[in-house]
Structure formats: structure tokens, C-alpha cells
Amino acid sequence: MTVRLASVSISNFRSCKSTSAILRPFTALVGYNNAGKSNIILAIKWLLDGSLISESDVYDPTHPVSVEGVIQGITDDTLSLLTEENQQKIAPFIIDGTLTFARRQEFNKETGKAKKSLDVYDGTTWKKNPGGIDGAISNIFPEPIHIPAMSDAVEDSTKCKNTTTIGKILSAIVSEIKQEHEEKFSKNISEIGKYLSHNGENRLESLNKIDSGVNKKVNQFFPDVSVKLHFPTPTLDEIFKSGTLKVFESREDEPVMRDISRFGHGTQRSIQMALIQYLAEIKKENSESKKSNTLIFIDEPELYLHPSAINSVRESLVTLSESGYQVIISTHSASMLSAKHAANAIQVCKDSNGTIARKTISEKIEELYKSSSPQLHSAFTLSNSSYLLFSEEVLLVEGKTETNVLYALYKKINGHELNPSKICIVAVDGKGSLFKMSQIINAIGIKTRILADCDFLSNILLTEHKDLLSTECDNLLTALIESINSGELSLNTKVTTFESFKSISSKDFIKICNHEKTQKHIHEIHQKLKDNGIYIWKSGDIEAVYGFGKKQTEWDSLLDCLCDESKDVRAVIKKYDEMEDFIKWI
């Protein structure tokens, strides 16, 4: 396993009064504006670099700031990055390949001066400021690459320092070239040194002439002192670290170099993302090359990008996360999350207690349904779960039939589109996972409702809803048994108790929904469930409401009606009142 930062706990940093998060090789922070996503990223950066923070970076200046981190995957290879002295200093604190440490800073109330410390956990107690640990962490994790939301793009792209974002990316890109040509480059650089250094074999005669002239003046004051001009040649590292970008625009005659500030933010952002994509490409092609431990932070990678480019950037970031880089992004775009990674995305929100990083879908699956976690992970992966994280409420529906037309029906009946930031419709493959997925989504702080066929009642009666519906279900069971015994209703399953509902087929449930003596009780159950966030079709299933089944011509007729403002949907949907009631319930 590649060494990585596995988790952080943040206290009193900016908007983060107290929150924690589990980090993965690819971690996405999602949430509305000003929720504190960028503050979590900055807290992680501060944990690693230990720069001095000001009082404006503190939630409550009367209390210390603390960010605790856990590094996992430390091996002998990792320790080889350290000096022997630092290896000895850090070794007592590494437990099963894990290092737990915390960076703290507090302000003296009287003087206002800041006091910093780096504490390390030895398995039983915290040790304050043990020597060598800060340097060891810096060697394990090179300085992170941070691409903010375009605030310093122009200045950053024109600087000639490896401390800039582009400088760091360029350094990572050319590292393979540097290793490949190091001997050749170093030889050529040393040749230049022979002409310019104070003791060069082929020192320029003009430099000797200057030395002679200057020494005549110096010797007038100090006869035993002499000087020689010396121009140090840059090392190969220094040359590559000074790399920058020149931007050219095509013209009829020849390309013209222009300052990057003359280009729009879209072009600037595209250049940054292009470098990230190319870095991912070469790392994927050179799978045998040494993996990096560098962290990459990007605020809103989707910013200024064309929708078709967002998916490409996402895949590049995932590739980097599989090549040793640890990638942490903040995003407002569901396109930045594949279904595979949505379950591990961290929803960030803010309330009166500051910024909170909620537990992920994966964490809640393990917490609530550990025994069936593989099936639930699959269920979330197969649904469009990346979109639900950006909504205030989720409507879970059974199967994709409903989602195919519900958005269009909503617009047709209500006269306006369903706002995806308010409500997201998520299709679930079969009714068996509806309750479990609902509980998990509710557990991560998103309100959830359910739409299902009437046969979902067999699942409902196995939950706490059974007590809620006890009177209505007793009445239904009594009416059902009477109708069966009298021969008025014929079912394929013998019904004597609530438990026997589990064996009733969907076709038989439709019969029950439309039978004169049981219909009233189905409507009572429907209303009570509706008031509690579950909508079951009173007619049995959605096909019964539409009035048709699977024929493509019938669906085409409905879709044609939904797309044509002049056509009345009442003429197409058999039980329009029931459909309208559901749409208004949304």
C-alpha cells in the first residue's frame, strides 16, 4: 500500500469548529458555496507544512487550533527517504506502519504571539515537539500541489519557481527526463563551469583580465589579498525547477507569444488541467516508475471547463490517485464523481457549529449493514448516486421505468422543471434495497422519500411501519380473507396472515388494489404511507396508472405528448388524477 494520509480531525481552524474526515487515494468534498470545503483542504495543507496562521484563520482565538492526522502505509522503503538520524527519531512512534501526529497553534492572550507545536502519539500518550518529526513528515510527503479556484492563475503561471503550482506539476512531469538525461546534462553543465568558475580549466581570458584590474586596486590597500570573479553554474535540479510556460496563439503568418493574462479564465484553467492530464498519462504509461507520495489539492476542477472535458479530467485525477498521488478535490459537479467514487465522497455542510464533514455512504453502509455491504455498494454504484450528493432531498424509485419519464411529467403537470439541486430521483434495481438505501441516505443527512409499486407493501410490513399501519392492515387482511373465501377474489397465493403477504405476486397485488372490497383499505394505507414519505401506487403499479405496459409505440405516444406543449397529457395517461397527485406530492 502506498503511504498516504488516512484521516484528519480539525479543531478551531477557520469555519471548522470540530470535524473529522476519512481520506482515500481519491477524495471528493462536495457541498454548497461557503460550506467550508476549501477550509478543510487548507487545514490539511497546514497539518503538513506547519506555516504560521493568523488570528483570522481561527474559529475562536481564545482556544488553540489543532489538526490531527494519521499516516498509513509507512514501510522500510518510506523510511529510506529520511536521514538515518530522523529514522531513529520517528521509529518509536510508528505503530504497524501508522503514524499519528497533530499540529497545534495558540495565541498568547497578552502578547498576541503565536506558539506552535507538533505532537506525536506513541500508542499511549502524546509527546510534545519531539525532534526530527517535522522534517521526517516533509520528506515523506513532498510539498503538496494546490490548484485554487483560479485566484492566482496569472501570477502562478508566469513565475519561475518550483514553489508555484505549475512549477510543481512541471517538475513532476520532467522528473523522468531528468533521470534519463542527468549524466549528459550534468556533463554539459560542468563544461560551462570550466569557463566561468574561479578555478575553471578553460576560464575566459576576459575574466582573468578583470581579475587583474580589480586586484591592482585591492592591492593598494591590502597587498596580500586578491580576488577572482566566480559565476556558479546552476545544477540540473535548479534548471528544471525554474521551468515555466510560454503561451502561443496561432496566427496566419506565425504563432504569436502572448502573456497568459491576455487569455480568458477558461484558457488558463484548461492549461492547468491539461498539465494534470498529461502527468496522469505519463504515470499510467510508466507504471514501473517510482510512485509519488505527493498530495494534489484542487478547488473545483470543473471550473471553466466544457462539460465533455470534465469527465476526462476526472479520469486523469483517478489515474493519478492510482499512481501514488493522493488527490483531494472540492466540487459542485456530479460529473466529477463516477458512481464508483460517489460512495466515498464527503458531503460538507455548515450550521451553527461550523463546518461539518459528514460520514460517507460507504461508512454508513459498514455501520448500518455490514453483513450485506457488498450488495449495497453495488446498488449505489449502479444508481446515479453521484447526483444525490448535490441535492437537498432524494426520491428513490423502483426501476428505471419511472425515471425515464418522471422529470418530463413533472414539468408537464407543474409547468416548470424539477430542480435537481432540490430533489434528485434515483433509480434502485428492485424493491429489496429501497429501505436500506433510504436509511443510509438519511444517515448522511439527506432527506429521502420512496416511490414504489403496491407490492412493496410486503416489504413495508417487515419494518417498523407495521405498527404504524396495524389498524389499516388488519382491516385489509379481514376484507381480503372474506373476499377470497366468498370466491369474489381469486389469488395464486393463500393469504391468512401478514407474513403471507410476502408470497403475493405483483399481479395479485394489482387485483387487490382494484377489488371493490379491498380498494378502500389500500387507499387508507396509501394515505398513511404518503404522510410518512412513502408513495405506493393505489392502482398497483405505474403501468396501471399509465394504462399501458411495455409496448414501445405506447411509450412513444406518451413521450411525444410530454415534448409537445400543445398536447394534453390527460388524453394519454389513463389515471391522470393519481399521477397528478403523485407529482404534487413531490
From Swiss-Prot:
Region (ATPase domain N-terminus), start-end ranges: 1-163
Which residues hold ATP? N34, A35, G36, K37, S38
Which stretches does the entry tag as region Toprim domain? 393-586
Note whether Ribonucleoprotein occurs among the keywords.
no
* Annotated catalysed reactions: Exonucleolytic cleavage in the 5'- to 3'-direction to yield nucleoside 5'-phosphates
Residue ranges for the region (ATPase domain C-terminus) are 271-390
TM segment ranges? none
Field pH dependence: Optimum pH is 7.2-8.8.
Q: Which residues bind a divalent metal cation 2?
A: E402, D541, E543
Enzyme class, one word? Answer: hydrolase
Cofactor binding, note field: Mg(2+) gave the most activity in a maltose-binding protein fusion.
Q: Does the keyword Lipid biosynthesis apply?
A: no
Mutation: E543A; reported impact is: No longer kills recB-recC deleted host cells
Q: What does this protein do?
A: An exonuclease that acts preferentially on linear dsDNA, processively degrading it from 5'-3', releasing 5'-phosphomononucleotides. Initiates on 5'-phosphate and 5'-hydroxyl ends. Also acts on linear ssDNA, nicked DNA and RNA. ATP enhances but is not necessary for exonuclease activity; has ATPase activity that is not stimulated by DNA. The old protein kills E.coli recB and recC mutants and interferes with phage lambda growth. Both the exonuclease and ATPase activities are required in vivo. Probably interferes with lambda phage by degrading its linear DNA.
Return the protein name.
Old nuclease
Upper lineage: Viruses, Duplodnaviria, Heunggongvirae, Uroviricota, Caudoviricetes
List the gene name: old
